[in-house]
Every structure is written in C-alpha cells, then in structure tokens.
C-alpha cells in the first residue's frame, strides 16, 4: 500500500490533518505543542483508491527530554513513506523549526514531497503573502485548512495522482486486529517494538510516554496482523491533564476498533485494583482477551510460582474465566511466539460453525441430565437452539418464557456448549427468547454472558 507521512514542526495541525484524512479522531489534537510523540498509522480511501497515512511528532530545535526519540520516529516515517506532506502553518508563520524540518527533508532527494500550508481559514487565497514560505525551498505550497476541510479534496487528488508512480502493492489479508491495553509502564510499547522489530514507539521508564492509540500492521510468519498500542490507563485521581483524559478515550476507542485484546499485567509486582478496572473494560467489550503477564524474567521463581500467579489472576479476574494466560518478557524477547500461537487458537474457535441438529442434541441432553430449577414460579423449558451470526460465538435458545431462567442454569448450559465444541478461549453469548408470540410481548429476552445476565 502507498505510504504518506505528515512531517513538520509542532502545532502546525499535522494531527488535525491526519484525523481529517482518515475521517476518525485517532490522534490527540490540542493546542499544547508536542502532543503527538509516536508515529500513528491510518488508512485513507479516496476515489476508490487507498493509501496509508502516517502522523508524526513535531520537529524542533528546542531541547526536550523526548525530542531525540521523536526525531528518530520521524526519520522512521520518512524512510518508510513514498510521499511526504511537509506541513507549515500560515497562522503561526515560519521560524527556525520550519527551516530545521525543511533541511532534514532536503536530505531525502528520492522522496516525493508535497508542500502544504495549513490554517488558511477565511483569507482570500489571492491576497495571501507567501513570499517567506518560498525560502524553505519547496516552491508554492498547497493551501488548506485541515480544521475546516478547505482544500482537502485537492490534496487528496494530488496524492492519488502520484500513486501510479509507485506501482500497485498487493494488499495482504489481515489474520487478526488486536489492541494492547494495561496500566502505565507494564511494557506495552516494549512488546509493540518486539512485534515490529524496530523502535516504533517511545520506550521510557517515565509512565505516560505513549499518549495516542497507535496502529501498525506487521508480518509474522508471513501472515499480516494489525496491532493497536494504547496509552496506559491511570487511576481516576491521577488523570491530571486533559491530554491524559484524551488518552483514556483513545484506549476505549482502540478497544472498539479491535477484534481481540491483549491485557498486559506486570508479573514483577502484585496485581492492583487498577488492573481489575482495566480488565473490566475487556469484559464489557465482550471480545476475546489474552492475559499477557510481562516481565516474567524479573520474577524469582520455583516450580509453583507460575501456578500461584495464575490463581491470583483467576481470583482477581473472575469475569474473564475463559481468557488464556501466557507469560512473557517483552524486553528480553522471551515467549513472544506464544502470543501468536494463542491468537491462532482463538481465531480457530471464533470460526467454529455448529450445525443446528448437533447443537440441539447437546443442549437437549444437558437439559435432560440436569433439569432447570423452578424460578419465578415455573420451570424453564428449552425447545430449540440455533447459532446466530456474531463476532463471537452467539446462540439463541427458544424457551417457554425467559423469565423462568436462573443465571446459574444459563451458566451450566454455557459450560456444556463450551465443552462440547471446544470453545474454551472465547467469550460466548446466549440469547434466551420466548417461542410463544404472546409471551414474547409479555416478557423480555435475556442475554447471558459468563458472570450474569441482562434484560434486553
């Protein structure tokens, strides 16, 4: 796929342009300079043609604790991109940072560079004073306002017009899209860098280094995956700035854009209430979740240590009993392959399709062996079961009246279905519906998940 990188000094509207192009607010946008630190990837479609857009941190001559690492990230983006959008701001004018960015880009004579002048709001284009911008050495800029969508169509036309110069790159089908979530400093970015085999995101002992939810596609054993790394979620009292509040929102959005979750824990410390809260997000999302215990190389172990830690996890995360638990060290690159082995197992279970006759045999047999308890004045009777379409295994059980369902019996049936069809690593959903039209009007359908049931 064609790759286009957005490069420029801080606060020229790079992230606003990125969000405008992908039509989705992924990058954090704020007036505070330096908000974007890592490379952020997104897909753009225009006139039936697609390309990948890369947002980058701001280039500056000023000293900053992260500036050297940010510049390294920008350099990575330039190296992998086919086209560079060099963005300046008409509102702020040019300064030493613009000239610094221009000097860096001029070193890449083999790259196609589109000079973009942003933050042109209501000015008449014919009355703009552009003389100072010619001094940067990239000719006349394309005039846009990312915030107000002015000139965006022309910019997209320019990019698509150059696409044929780079040939058609065959797009490989994704095996899985997953996000990595966890509290700050558990090693999410270290894991991402191992997966991508390069320093894609900033890694530091300072919690909160990653602010955005960062998309990246990568190949493992010749198969393509998409991973979304997220900012760590802090305790509510520690969310001191609006930037970190945005980061929590990005994490929640990352989950909504994923098909699977890697919940990272720090194996070198005890589990915390914060870990439990984040685990609750996994349950609410109702997505397959792999519990990844990181920093296992730092733990003093004997032959019982792993099992004891697993018991602690099961006790804390009772609402995720189906989630597999794996132990890794991202920094030392230990047991990373177990992540992909587990993903493949989960993918296989998600694809299981069960014939209606076989499903009914299992449910009716379970129904005969263990009769439902009397609940709300009557006993539940199940007459028919079928598998419905869904992102996770979903089953509809037609019964005399869902009001007679006790949650313990729903859990019993779920476990029987899991055992019969090998659905051990994925969440499943049971819908109990009345077979009788009259009862359907008088009662509500019941949706059951592992830890309880909700009225629909």
Swiss-Prot record:
Gene3D superfamilies: 3.30.300.20, P-loop containing nucleotide triphosphate hydrolases (3.40.50.300). Residues 352-436 form the KH-like domain. It holds the Pfam family MMR_HSR1. GTP 1 binds at residues 8-15, 55-59, 118-121. Residues 2-167, 176-351 form the EngA-type G domain. Keywords: GTP-binding, Nucleotide-binding, Repeat, Ribosome biogenesis. GTP 2 binds at residues 182-189, 229-233, 294-297. InterPro entries: G_ENGA, GTP-bd, GTPase_Der, KH_dom-like, KH_dom-like_a/b, P-loop_NTPase, Small_GTP-bd. Belongs to the TRAFAC class TrmE-Era-EngA-EngB-Septin-like GTPase superfamily. EngA (Der) GTPase family. This is GTPase Der.
């Amino acid at each position: 796929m064609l790759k286009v990188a957005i490069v420029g000094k801080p606060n020229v509207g790079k992230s606003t342009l990125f969000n405008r192009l992908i039509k989705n607010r992924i990058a954090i946008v704020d007036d505070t300079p330096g908000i974007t630190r890592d490379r952020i990837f997104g897909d753009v479609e225009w006139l039936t043609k697609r390309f990948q857009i890369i947002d980058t941190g701001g280039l500056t001559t000023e000293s900053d604790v992260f500036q050297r690492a940010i510049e390294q990230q920008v350099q990575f983006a330039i190296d992998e991109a086919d086209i560079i959008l060099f963005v300046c701001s008409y509102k702020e004018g040019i300064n030493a940072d613009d000239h610094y960015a221009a000097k860096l880009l001029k070193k890449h004579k083999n790259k196609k560079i589109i000079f973009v002048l942003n933050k042109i709001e209501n000015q008449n284009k014919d009355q703009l004073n552009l003389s100072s911008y010619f001094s940067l050495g990239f000719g006349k800029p394309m005039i846009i306002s990312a915030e107000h969508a002015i000139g965006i169509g022309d910019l997209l036309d320019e990019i698509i017009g150059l696409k044929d110069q780079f040939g058609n790159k065959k797009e490989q089908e994704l095996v899985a899209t997953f996000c990595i979530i966890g509290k700050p400093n558990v090693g999410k970015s270290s894991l991402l860098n191992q997966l991508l085999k390069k320093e894609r995101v900033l890694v530091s002992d300072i919690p909160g280094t990653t602010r955005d939810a960062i998309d990246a596609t990568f190949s493992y054993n010749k198969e393509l995956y998409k991973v979304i790394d997220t900012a760590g979620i802090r305790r509510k009292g520690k969310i001191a700035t609006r930037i970190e509040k945005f980061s929590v929102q990005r994490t929640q959005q990352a989950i909504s854009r994923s098909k699977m979750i890697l919940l990272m824990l720090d194996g070198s410390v005890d589990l915390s209430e914060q870990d439990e809260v984040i685990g609750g997000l996994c349950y609410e999302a109702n997505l397959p979740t792999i519990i990844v215990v990181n920093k296992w190389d730092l733990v003093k172990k004997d032959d019982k240590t792993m099992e004891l830690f697993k018991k602690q996890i099961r006790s804390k995360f009772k609402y995720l009993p189906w989630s597999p638990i794996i132990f890794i060290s991202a920094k030392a690159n230990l047991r990373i392959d177990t992540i992909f082995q587990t993903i493949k197992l989960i993918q296989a279970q998600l694809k299981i399709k069960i014939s209606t006759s076989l499903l009914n045999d299992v449910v009716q047999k379970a129904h005969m062996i263990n009769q439902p308890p009397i609940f709300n004045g009557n006993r539940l009777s199940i007459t028919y079961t079928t598998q419905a379409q869904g992102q996770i295994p979903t089953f509809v059980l037609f019964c005399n009246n869902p009001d007679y369902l006790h949650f313990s019996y729903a859990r019993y049936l779920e476990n029987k279905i899991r055992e019969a069809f090998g659905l051990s690593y994925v969440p499943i959903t049971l819908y109990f519906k009345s077979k009788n039209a009259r009862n359907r009007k008088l009662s509500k359908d019941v949706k059951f998940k592992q830890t309880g049931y909700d009225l629909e």
